[in-house]
């Protein structure tokens, strides 16, 4: 399988997993009605509607802000797709595919609901104090793993084979 096809496949898998989990948690599991659901001592399911970007930055910007964020995301997705089409390593194309799939998943939420559906909360109690990570979703995980793959590929990965 060519590197680009691997990237496209990674993006499709990330997008499908993201949307299926969100739809199931919203409409099958009814997370909104259940509130906080403890899965493990350090992991809860909790519904959060993120109208901003990472960590809720730029939330509350209204319809104009939502349109601007979607437009920026569309441009970024096109740029990442061009980069993926030109990439020569499998790891880079997989990483770019994961980022694209995650970005599209969150963009679908923004179009459908006016906010991104976040649901996973990691936390730890240390010395009697509770520390929470931000609430995230599968698309966010795909984006982070994709960025990590790109960093690894560019800093440590094997050089791409040269064409004859």
From Swiss-Prot:
Query: Main localization of the protein?
Result: membrane
Gene that codes for this? lspA
Pathway stated in the Swiss-Prot or TrEMBL entry:
Protein modification; lipoprotein biosynthesis (signal peptide cleavage)
The answer on whether this UniProt entry bears the keyword Transmembrane helix reads yes
Protein name, per record = Lipoprotein signal peptidase
Q: List, from the UniProt record, the residues annotated as the active site of this protein.
A: 118, 140
| Localization terms from the record | Cell inner membrane
Query: Which residue ranges run through the membrane?
Result: 6-26, 39-59, 65-85, 88-108, 141-161
Tell me the protein family, please. Belongs to the peptidase A8 family.
Give the GO biological process terms. Answer: proteolysis
Q: Which UniProt keywords apply?
A: Aspartyl protease, Cell inner membrane, Cell membrane, Hydrolase, Membrane, Protease, Transmembrane, Transmembrane helix
The task this protein performs is described as: This protein specifically catalyzes the removal of signal peptides from prolipoproteins.
């Amino acid at each position: 399988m060519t590197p680009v096809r691997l990237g496209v496949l990674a993006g499709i898998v990330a997008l499908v997993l993201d949307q299926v989990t969100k739809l199931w948690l919203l409409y099958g599991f009814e997370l909104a009605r259940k509130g906080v659901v403890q899965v493990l001592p350090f992991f809860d399911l909790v519904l959060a509607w993120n109208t901003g970007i990472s960590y809720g930055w730029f939330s509350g910007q209204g319809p104009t802000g939502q349109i601007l964020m979607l437009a920026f995301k569309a441009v970024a997705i096109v740029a990442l797709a061009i980069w993926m089409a030109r990439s020569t390593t499998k790891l880079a194309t997989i990483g770019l595919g994961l980022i694209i799939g995650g970005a599209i998943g969150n963009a679908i939420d923004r179009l459908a609901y006016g906010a991104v559906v976040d649901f996973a909360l990691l936390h730890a109690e240390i010395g009697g104090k509770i520390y929470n990570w931000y609430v995230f979703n599968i698309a966010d995980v795909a984006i982070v793993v994709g960025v990590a793959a790109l960093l690894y590929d560019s800093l440590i990965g094997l050089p791409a084979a040269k064409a004859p």
